[in-house]
Amino acid sequence: MNDWQWLKNRLVNAKTKAVSFWLAQTTSTILDIAELIKCCSDLKNTSINGLVDLINQQEKLEFNLTRLKEIDGEDARQLFGIEGNVYKHFQTELSRFYKQTRKHFRETGSESLFLGLPVIEGINEFNDVFRAPLLYVGVKLKVAPRLERFWLEINREEIFLNPTIIGVEINKRNSLFKNNYDTTKVDINQALEIFRELEYQFRMPLTSELKSFSKKAKSDFNTEKRTNFLTNNVLLGIFDVKGDQLFQNFNEILNTDPDVLDELLKDRRDLLYDNREFRENFNLKGTYLFSHLDIFQQYAVKQAFDGDVIIEGPPGTGKSETIVNILVNLALNKKKVLFVSEKVTALDVVYNRLGSFKHIALFNASVASEKKRFYSQFADYESFFTDNFSKKDLVNEMPVFDGQWVDKILSEFTNLQNIYDTQINSGNQSYSFKEILSSFPILDVSYIKIKEHDRFDEWVRVFSSQVWLEKHLTYLAFKAELSKRWQNIDNFYALKDLLEKRKNIRVLCYVLDYFEQNNSIIKPKRVLLYTPTERGQKQLHQLQQDVAKYNSLQRFKSAAKFETIKLNLANKLAQNAKPFFFSWFIQTHAQTLLENLVQTQKQLVKAKQSYLSKIEQYVVSCKRILKATILANFFELYQTNKNELLDICREAKNPVLKEITWWFKKNFALLSKLFPVHIMTFESAALLTPNQRRLYDYVVIDEASQVYLERAIPILYRGAKYIIAGDTKQLKPSNFFQARAEYDVDEEFEDGNVEAAVHSTSLLHFLKNRSRILTLLKFHYRSDSANLIAFTNNRIYNNELIFMNKATADKQVFIVHDVIDGIWRNNRNLQEARDVVQRLEQLTQTAEYQKSLGVICFNKNQAELIEYMIDKQNNPLLNEWRDRVNAQGEYVGLFVKNIENVQGDERDIIIFSLGYDRSVNSYGPISKQGGENRLNVAITRAKQRIELFKTNRASDYNGLSSNSLGSKLLVEYLLYCEAMANNQGESLDFQATQKQAPKAKYELELENQFFNELELIFGEQFTIKRNVNEGAYSFSFVFYFNENPYLAVDFNPALPHSRKEVSENIIYREQFLKKRKWNLVNIWLDEWKLNPGGVLQKLRNCLTHSENEFEEI
């Protein structure tokens, strides 16, 4: 068994840094309201006892700030330590505090707002100094319009005895302790009695008067005397005491089943798993599609079903959409699922994307804050069932996708490749049909008469003979000579015929003598009284010689061959046989191949279109069966547990809503049947569900890089299998026991406590190399401009992301504002903050006001300064911008955050306030270990534009030679922004395009010819660029109109050789282009070569489209 004590120790040590254990002073999220209670509340008995009575008996505590107008001067200094207008001061403080609570709720789903009273302080036996409220009472803060009044609505369902101080004590003692505090009321004496059981004694105050909370340091406590005190302080603030339920769950697990940690965290790697083989053999069979996913998302969904999977989702790669589909797949396979995240925004996004199918999941981000929303889910479900139920829906068969479609497409590509690769033999040489198609000229080859193409080289040799030509000329000359000698050539032929038929010399001589005398040829049968003359014998000899020579020249007599050889010699065919062979083959022997080629290309387009059509139908079918499943879940429970089901559904109509924790646990079994998916925060899951092994079939955890390992143990414990999603290149967890707003001041990064948090092990980092499978999402969708993601893709993700510009992306993607007179002083830059706020006000007067916007600062003080200035301006347009939500109820307002708090956010426009000037050598959290991850999160939030405010030129900042990777990358990024803003981005090396296979010379020549023709015909109307690298992709040609990409052309596209390549490089490349609003057309080289007019018309048709819509052609 492994020793997991280090996990427990880290958990306990982190607890000692929580504001519910040690609170030195009030903060922006914790207010001292003791004097406000005495001066402004409607409480008659303003002692601690009077306040306790009110909490136990009344529903709210009201405050009238206008009473503060009567307090000034010395009273203000004595009561509040404030110079000036007390009323205005508290109006401002209340306004800021109210906004902090709303921001906290948006990010966590829980207000975590409590009254803390009284405060206990001292030193425990382990020398831990503690100072925090003894009791916590949940409240809701309500404010009047002009902040003249506010009130606290008391929630007696959330009363906690300080669980942190107790938890640290019993864990360090390694003892079992049962906290029997009655959480239905506030009882200070009972709370102190619980602490006395742990041997804590407190010196009590002399009176019950409420006291102001003073600032203290740990050094103020005497470690030798160890005196503990109780002070009648009252604090109002954000305290993460509900998160202590996870702490308790963890302790229960460790104490009752310590061996289970070995099982939960064991190395589950499948050493025999071949990811490449999985991708090659991948098909959708058995996987349901709730929406259109890219191929890497489909891989993740398929792999997730086997469980114990890590899904790495870099920024903007569709991680939430992937999770939605995973949840749907698990639900359709009748699995019980718990989906959790630290950020409620991540939960909201997933839940909202379920749309009208949301009844498959039960959503509860906050146990107490959203009762109405929680209970309304059941009433909505009943209405959905009533409106949609039909018994015929219960007999739907599960849809099945034909996994052979990719094979069919690959088969057509293979056929096409085989046709191109067909070897054509000319006799001595062999050529691919593709080369012949690409290179053949239009020549007159009608005179080449051969049946078999493999005899072409032999024909060339025979019909290119200069010797034969000369022999033919000799033949013609000799023939002329014969015609002259024998009066005409016909006489020669007759005499030749006689000579060859008659062997009698006397007869032959007689004929020749007669020919000489009469110039005619006789045919005697016999000669009786004739004696051959000497002349006759000479003529016979001459004839015999002429016939012999004539016969020897007979094979050179062909006039046709003579003309052919003349042509061949004139064309230098022997030296230039290839183009003639190519042209001759295409014209006389290629018909069958060409017909097969055209047919295959048609079949290929048809197969791709069919695949996409089937995918579309499959998504519809999957949604139909999901709807049927939702109805069936309700129907089955209606059949078996009708009364209980209807009671659940009608709970929302009760005037007083029941406590969710009690009600949820009471109905847990029924709710699990009704909703196969439960969506919760970590705290909600710990409070609502039993701390039971394998309570769910799967647990799905999002944003897991920000989750401490020990915090995740109780969630992992509840699941049989896990699916972990996140990004190891983003933020590691910050100390979640501290109020988020109090983390990351620059000075804090100098101490060891926060540095320890930076080195902490997140759930994602710990399990990454222990999970069964690791899968990566690659297609990047968030950034409209490739330049917004190119830097981080190159520097952080090693060019693994697939991205490109949207066809409609703005041209001005980076704007750099140089701040004049900016100075980094007291951890902030005042002038830069002014410039940022001024810019925000400018944008409210433009069309940009309709977009979403976020301001990201590189340290907390700068963020607080900018927020303070915005508050002070009180601009109605800025206020509306800050509060904006979309149609789904998701917060999309203007935010101001530091880099620690923006993971998971995205906005159309991101404004960076760097703050630092060139005098700085360390950039706070960016310069610490993991700073590159912080920078990565910050610079990947923008969808459309980044605006950078900085005081000096990028080259003036220190960091390029720093040992800190974060510092180095920050300065590199500043240089990058400047270059992009000045349209000098091409000088930077951020090549992300996938390598292309080299092209043959003949392919390049044809491509050049095609380009020249495009320029000639379309060049006046469009700008045409060739070999365009666009993000991760390259195109042969791109037509631009008004600098916008109008049409991309893949000329002679590379063919895939595997199923993986078909999916990743063909089908989903084209689908990605569609989502990026690019038009694409494929032009096959044979298409251009054989029918250039048709190709040009095809391009004209594409270019006449009035809108940029993708169309596969």
From Swiss-Prot:
<dbReference type="InterPro" id="IPR041679">
    <property type="entry name" value="DNA2/NAM7-like_C"/>
</dbReference>
<dbReference type="Pfam" id="PF13086">
    <property type="entry name" value="AAA_11"/>
</dbReference>
<dbReference type="InterPro" id="IPR047187">
    <property type="entry name" value="SF1_C_Upf1"/>
</dbReference>
<keyword id="KW-0547">Nucleotide-binding</keyword>
<feature type="binding site">
    <location>
        <begin position="313"/>
        <end position="320"/>
    </location>
    <ligand>
        <name>ATP</name>
    </ligand>
</feature>
<protein>
    <recommendedName>
        <fullName>Uncharacterized ATP-dependent helicase MG140 homolog</fullName>
        <ecNumber>3.6.4.-</ecNumber>
    </recommendedName>
</protein>
<keyword id="KW-0067">ATP-binding</keyword>
<dbReference type="Pfam" id="PF13195">
    <property type="entry name" value="DUF4011"/>
</dbReference>
<comment type="similarity">
    <text>Belongs to the DNA2/NAM7 helicase family.</text>
</comment>
<dbReference type="InterPro" id="IPR025103">
    <property type="entry name" value="DUF4011"/>
</dbReference>
<dbReference type="InterPro" id="IPR041677">
    <property type="entry name" value="DNA2/NAM7_AAA_11"/>
</dbReference>
<keyword id="KW-0378">Hydrolase</keyword>
<dbReference type="Pfam" id="PF13087">
    <property type="entry name" value="AAA_12"/>
</dbReference>
<dbReference type="GO" id="GO:0016787">
    <property type="term" value="F:hydrolase activity"/>
</dbReference>
<dbReference type="InterPro" id="IPR045055">
    <property type="entry name" value="DNA2/NAM7-like"/>
</dbReference>
<dbReference type="GO" id="GO:0005524">
    <property type="term" value="F:ATP binding"/>
</dbReference>
<dbReference type="GO" id="GO:0004386">
    <property type="term" value="F:helicase activity"/>
</dbReference>
<keyword id="KW-0347">Helicase</keyword>
<dbReference type="InterPro" id="IPR027417">
    <property type="entry name" value="P-loop_NTPase"/>
</dbReference>
